[in-house]
Regions:
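A generic structural signal for short
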Residues: 12-13, 42-43, 80-81, 119-120, ...
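Histidine-acidic metal/acid-base catalytic patches
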Residues: 1-32, 159-273
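A generic structural signal for short coil/turn motifs at secondary-structure boundaries
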Residues: 12-16, 77, 115, 152-155, ...
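N-terminal pre-domain/capping segments
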Residues: 1-102, 125, 136, 170, ...
Length: 273
């Protein structure tokens, strides 16, 4: 199992330009990571010259970009906005293909009060299926996540409640969409991750390793200092034969120190399996 990192603690630095993507990749390589993850928020254009420059810089750093994260809002009550979201996602898929990014994490949408659970499930599943058809034109694998709330949104994820997540997940089983399984988001709902993992393990392609301060509370902390049963999850994955990427979602707010300690913790756990 290889290890990459989505550097949530560095989002402000990277999105503002204080830290370049090349510098992030070079730093991750020095720490020991096998790859890096990016947010679409970090990419400021989709012109060919810009993307060629970004790819050259990342290639010089010598680490693959494993996963990009994006934030489609397919449960928006306005049909015109939902179409915009679909078009934005199609662009993101093409952009990932051009940058050589293997995985693109996708979401259901936000929990809009005007949209019922039944309507939201239908809308999310329909649009994700359409996005899968777009991804099929490229070398990009879409990954759906049991997600909570990104900074890019004002509301929590519509499918944050695990029962809603399962309803959408079940409607995607005949598509090419696989899963990015997030440990911390389940703990934040005061649920145990292992039983949830058992339900979806045959569709898990990557794992977001995150940690929370307590069950029932969305409060990210340094990886290995919280209550998430990370070691138990890794043992079960190994027993299943999982050989995919462990994508650390480092959101403790401790910057590079937190990102380095997260790698040491997960690296040691993997070596002990």
């Amino acid at each position: 199992m290889k290890i990459s990192c989505l550097p949530v603690s560095l989002f402000d630095d990277i999105c503002s330009g204080r830290m370049s993507l090349q510098a992030w990749a070079e730093t991750a390589k020095e720490i020991g990571y096998d790859g890096i993850d990016l947010s679409m928020l970090m990419l400021t254009a989709h012109t060919e010259t810009y993307l060629q420059r970004i790819r050259r810089e990342l290639d010089r750093a010598g680490l693959p970009v494993v996963m990009a994260t994006t934030y489609p809002d397919f449960t928006h009550p306005d049909p015109k906005q939902r179409q915009r979201e679909a078009d934005y996602l199609a662009r993101d898929i093409a952009l990932c293909d051009q940058l050589g990014i293997r995985y693109l994490r996708v979401l259901a949408g936000q929990a809009h009060q005007e949209v019922s659970e039944e309507a939201g499930v239908t809308l999310a599943a329909e649009h994700l299926r359409q996005a899968d058809a777009v991804a099929g034109k490229y070398t990009v694998q879409l990954l759906y996540e049991n997600h909570a709330k990104p900074g890019a949104w004002s509301k929590v994820d519509f499918s944050y409640p695990i029962d809603i997540f399962f309803r959408i997940f079940d409607q995607l089983k005949d598509t090419g969409i696989l899963l990015n399984f997030d440990i911390g988001n389940i703990v934040a709902q005061n649920r145990e991750p292992l039983p949830i993992l058992e339900r979806v393990i045959d569709r898990v392609e990557t794992v977001h390793i995150s940690d929370m301060s307590a069950y029932g509370k969305f409060d990210p902390v340094e990886i290995g200092t919280g209550v998430c049963p990370i070691q138990d999850i890794l043992k079960r994955l190994k027993g299943y034969g999982f050989q995919g990427w462990l994508c650390i979602e480092e959101a403790s707010g401790h910057g590079l120190a937190g990102i380095a300690s997260a790698w040491r913790y997960v690296h040691n756990l993997v070596n002990e399996l």
